[in-house]
Amino acid sequence: MRAVQIDVHGGPEALVVREVPDPQCGEGQVLVRTVASTLNPVDWKTRAWDVGPALPATLGWDLAGVVVASGSPEFAVGDRVIAMSAQVATGRGTWAELVALPEHLLTPAPKSLALVEAATLPLAGTTAVQALDKLRLQRGDRLLVTGAAGAVGGLAVQLARQAGVEVDGLVSRPEHVEPVRELGAGTVTHLVSDLPERAYDAVFDTAGVDVTAALVEGGGYVSVSDEPLPDVPGAAKSYVQESAKDLAALVELVDAGRLRVRVAEYHPVSEVRTAHERFEAGGLSGKVVLLF
């Protein structure tokens, strides 16, 4: 089978598509033929930085595909599934034509989406769910999401609105303002200087931007960026954890028409270097999908 691997850390040129042995499906595991995956910030960071499992390593966290062998009573051959694999910690990369994962990581794919769209949901959606859970938001609270046009930020806007939270967004470019409004945000701006002072009960920071002046005293602050936390009492990082339960809840919202995903570009796996270049250039409003 083909897989996307790195032998050294570096730029997009470090990515290699090569033949590797097919994985075996053991007891309690499910073997999935990959239809699509996506690019996430952790993927280019793992490629570029000296982090992650021993090399050579297969990259990728998101998975959408079809079961081709099962050592689990929960999944049968032919089932459409999605999953998130914590590649950095486990070494189980999903950028491969066949992926074997523990059964507890998989959930049935949304019925209302093609698998190439469903691939956008696992890491970004799980990250948003778990970060918002940390904030313990109440109906009527006012939330600011930074990086609201990104995959995580855009899903967070929608999820918070579903919970009855008033959501505003900070984006990096003027052209991203209207798309974020369409996701349900109230006020959206690309200028930090436009943010009202001491107006938000909570901040979900996906972009590493200093917006502490906009937070009420004692407000909640959760970040998934690589930047250091601001000097705010109780400020916390949120590190995503594998959770089929969270993923199943997201699937339910998608199939109910209450949560939508966004795709910016599709690339065949043979163009993975180009996909990385486009992703790192920024400015996209939606996910970059890899097709297998």
PLM features: residue spans?
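C-terminal hydrophobic helical "lid"/dimerization subdomain
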Residues: 248-292
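Short glycine/proline-centered loop/turn elements that form peptide/ligand docking sites
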Residues: 70-74, 81, 169-179, 209
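NAD(P)H dinucleotide-binding glycine-rich loop of Rossmann-like/cofactor-binding domains
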Residues: 84-144
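Glycine-rich beta-strand-centered segment in the early N-terminal region that forms part
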Residues: 21-38, 48-87
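Mid-domain Rossmann-like dinucleotide-binding core that forms the NAD(H)/NADP(H) cofactor-binding site
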Residues: 121-191
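Glycine-rich cofactor phosphate-binding loops and adjacent beta1-alpha1 units
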Residues: 168, 178-237
